[in-house]
Swiss-Prot record:
<keyword id="KW-0489">Methyltransferase</keyword>
<keyword id="KW-0238">DNA-binding</keyword>
<comment type="similarity">
    <text>Belongs to the N(4)/N(6)-methyltransferase family.</text>
</comment>
<dbReference type="Pfam" id="PF18755">
    <property type="entry name" value="RAMA"/>
</dbReference>
<dbReference type="GO" id="GO:0009007">
    <property type="term" value="F:site-specific DNA-methyltransferase (adenine-specific) activity"/>
</dbReference>
<protein>
    <recommendedName>
        <fullName>DNA methyltransferase CcrM</fullName>
        <ecNumber>2.1.1.72</ecNumber>
    </recommendedName>
</protein>
<dbReference type="InterPro" id="IPR001091">
    <property type="entry name" value="RM_Methyltransferase"/>
</dbReference>
<dbReference type="Pfam" id="PF01555">
    <property type="entry name" value="N6_N4_Mtase"/>
</dbReference>
<dbReference type="InterPro" id="IPR002941">
    <property type="entry name" value="DNA_methylase_N4/N6"/>
</dbReference>
<keyword id="KW-0235">DNA replication</keyword>
<dbReference type="GO" id="GO:0032259">
    <property type="term" value="P:methylation"/>
</dbReference>
<comment type="function">
    <text>Overexpression from a moderate-copy number plasmid (10-12 copies/cell) leads to enlarged, branched cells, many with 3-5 genome equivalents. Contributes to the accurate cell-cycle control of DNA replication and cellular morphology.</text>
</comment>
<keyword id="KW-0808">Transferase</keyword>
<dbReference type="InterPro" id="IPR002052">
    <property type="entry name" value="DNA_methylase_N6_adenine_CS"/>
</dbReference>
<dbReference type="GO" id="GO:0005737">
    <property type="term" value="C:cytoplasm"/>
</dbReference>
<feature type="domain" description="RAMA">
    <location>
        <begin position="271"/>
        <end position="373"/>
    </location>
</feature>
<dbReference type="InterPro" id="IPR029063">
    <property type="entry name" value="SAM-dependent_MTases_sf"/>
</dbReference>
Length: 377
């Protein structure tokens, strides 16, 4: 199936159906003009690193290292690279939703310059992630430390950009119930995952591992979200997005990369809905006021609540507050006051009695949330 759209044939701010799940062939800045404002949820950008290689690099046995010497990684000066970076970041910022985020990966050659442009343009840096490579290329000349990592910058569209996706609970669960850190350990792309041409040569010199993209998408997007990659290359972003139930749009100007990416993406089988369910924490659940429990008839004014050991008691009032020891307040405030604490989670502290069994009022909040979900709220 052809995924390719030609940038010059798409209208400015083309409708979603014209570019969704496709590869737009063309320069990234002009191609981005074809996308509407605020049309993508997450951007992953792997721009040229501007490696500034001065000649061939050889191993100790005099064999030549396959390094990045392609024309697309060559710029006349730092000023030219900065101007290029600013242009594509501005274009990306326009199409990114207000609650969207961007990931940019780079090496020490370019990531600091990219970070400066991100901040100057109003993006708000959330994290820098260190990708530690388990199998990095050696430093053959022995004149500096082995370069064993790359850096990712994760940023929201603006400082006040609230509501961006971060699947904290899922990342923690995937990390043996320990908070996931900002240093990630992955091998570079090798073996059967590495795309080769008919001569056995690498299709793309900087192909990223699918595991890296999968973690990025699982951390910062939801099924059905749109992932943009303005430097699509061999299509890792598109392949992972399709497998994980996300939409993608890639921009690439080199036909050999487009051909390889198209074949690769067409061969991907998406995961099922059950496998794509993202674990959420309480912070992701809709807020429920205690008065909602009463309005639903699950508790009545005058009901006596107590803690699970029946040491403290409070009476429910018609206005949704509790009263105990002559003082009135919220379920949280009264729970804290009766214990002499500064704070308390009233939902888990207070219990009601049903058929002789004490149950936390949080069970009633769960019923309300289920009703909200059923109603599509």
């Amino acid at each position: 199936m052809s995924l390719v759209r030609l940038a010059h044939e798409l209208p400015i701010e083309a409708p979603r159906t014209a570019w969704l799940d496709s590869i737009i062939k063309g320069d990234c800045v002009s191609a981005l003009e074809r996308l509407p404002d605020h049309s993508v949820d997450v951007i992953f950008a792997d721009p040229p690193y501007n490696l500034q290689l001065g000649g061939d690099l050889h191993r100790p046995d005099q064999s030549m290292v396959s390094a990045v010497d392609d024309h697309w990684d060559q710029f006349e000066s730092f000023q030219a690279y900065d101007a290029f970076t600013r242009a594509w970041l501005l274009a990306c910022r326009r199409v990114l939703k207000p609650n969207g985020t961007i990931w940019v990966i780079g090496s020490y050659h370019n990531i600091f310059r990219v970070g400066t442009q991100l901040q100057d343009l109003g993006f708000w840096l959330l994290n820098d992630i260190v990708w530690r490579k388990t199998n990095p290329m050696p430093n053959f000349r022995g004149r500096r430390f082995q370069n064993a990592h790359e850096t990712l910058i994760w940023a929201s569209r603006e400082q006040k950009g609230k509501g961006y996706t971060f699947n904290y609970e899922a990342m923690k669960a995937a990390n043996d119930d320990v908070q996931m850190r900002s240093d990630w350990l992955f091998p570079i792309c090798t073996g059967s995952e590495r795309l080769k041409d008919e001569n056995g040569d690498k299709v793309h010199p900087t192909q990223k591992p699918e595991a890296l993209l999968a973690r990025i998408m699982m951390a910062s997007s939801k099924p059905g979200d749109v992932i943009l990659d303005p430097f699509f290359g061999s299509g890792t972003t598109g392949a992972v997005a399709k497998r994980l139930g996300r939409h993608f749009v890639g921009i690439e100007r080199e036909q050999p990369y487009i051909d390889a990416a198209t074949a690769r993406i067409n061969a991907v089988e998406p995961l099922g809905k059950a496998e794509l369910t993202v674990m959420t924490g309480k912070r992701a659940e809709p807020r429920v006021a205690f008065t909602s429990v009463m309005e639903a008839g699950l508790l009545r004014p005058g009901t006596v609540l107590c803690d699970e050991r029946r040491r403290f008691a409070a009476i429910v009032r018609a206005d949704g507050t509790l009263t105990a020891n002559g003082e009135a307040g919220s379920i949280h405030r009264i729970g804290a006051r009766v214990q002499g604490f500064d704070a308390c989670n009233g939902w888990t502290f207070w219990h009601f009695e049903e058929n002789g069994v004490l149950k936390p009022i949080d069970a009633l909040r769960k019923i309300i949330r289920e009703q909200m979900a059923a109603a599509g709220a």
